[in-house]
Amino acid sequence: QGHPDLKCPGVEFCGGSLGIGLSYSIGNALAARIDGKDHRIYTIIGDGESDEGQVWEAAMTAAKYKIDNMTVFLDRNFIQQDSYTEKIMPLDEELLGDDLSEMWKDASRWKTGDKWRSFGWNVIEIDGHRIEQISDAIRRANQTKGLPSIIIARTIKGKGVEHMEDNPQWHGKAPKPEIVPIIEDELESQFMIAPSIIAGDMSNLEKEVKQCVAGRADYIHLDVMDGQFVPNKTFDHTKIKELRPLTLIPFDAHLMIDEPVKHVSNYIDAGSDIITVHAEVCDESTFGEICDMLHSNEVGIGLAINPDTELPQWCYKFVELLDQVIIMSVVPGKSGQKFIESTHEKTRRIAKDLKEHKFEGYIEADGGVNLENIGACFEDGARAFVGGSAIIGQSDVRMIIKEFRNQVLESRRRLLIKKAHD
């Protein structure tokens, strides 16, 4: 069964691919209004049925009757029954070739949101793989009065499963039961490539962000240095706020600053998706304050340690809240350093320790990561990889990100084969 089924808890109606689900939901929302009920209707539609007229008739109806007790999700993964939507009937713009890399994350090329706005809808566009963005979008939609709301969630179909990811051939198909355990292992070992833009042209960081977009980076790593905690100085929250409209790629803000508790709110307001502070400038009390601020604002929580620092004992009180732990493999604040080899053993030890304490986030390897050592970093337990001059400093950023990803995939295949034999 390729479509949501009534056997799935919470699903009350299955519209299939004919686009009638939105009309059904509007009927429910109007009935709730007539009956004086305050419940809310949630509807998920795909981009395939958004090529059809039924959806747009319903869109006009929802705007006419100001249906604000309904939230619609558009799963914008660019794939429909026959191929990519942008090749069959473009919702954004026509796709030439098969490479969606740039269009997927380049906000300047998106037209779908404008179409819904022209029909009188409140439109919220998000990265559909960030639970924090989903939660925040639902809250904003629920607060909107007098307009129907749609959350356009940019997603990658089959994300994390190598043979399914961004593959139209897997539309409406379920995997065979015998390969499900492998798929589960793949999902448990998803990874992210995070280029650090300070390795590029500091006078034109907009260009560096666009290179990351074109290369289909998973995160954009933002190294904030204040000249006090580390000797160098880069940029602050004002620059992050300027860059934020360029893309929905999550901003991974690494604050190498003194007294971060005094400044974190500025980086939240600037649009950071994940904010990491250093254990060296926190104690249990200040980190608790930071956690509260980040958690209440739907921002990922990160803690970083320098090469000569171990995780402090107080951090284990927050371990179930942590989204990421950065283990520095170079001395922060200096560029062009080589990876400190002892970091491999340190990462393996910390990964084991965190797992025993029920850590459900991921470890990020930061500093000197390159094509030669990224596979070993993955095998150590890291799942996010910051690349500075090894990515941004290269002539073809798109190709080098692809090569980074291929190296990790090769290591992951080896681990999966070993586990299967064990």
Question: Which sequence ranges carry the predicted segments?
Answer:
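Conserved anion-binding
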Residues: 204, 262-263, 272-360, 415
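Cofactor-binding active-site loop characterized by glycine-rich and histidine/acidic residues
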Residues: 1-65
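Glycine-rich, proline-tolerant flexible connector loops at the mouths of alpha/beta enzymes
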Residues: 220-237, 277-281, 330-338, 389, ...
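Catalytic cores of alpha/beta
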Residues: 209, 259-269, 308-322, 367-385
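Hydrophobic faces of well-ordered beta-strands that scaffold small-molecule active sites
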Residues: 191-196, 220-222, 251-255, 273-277, ...
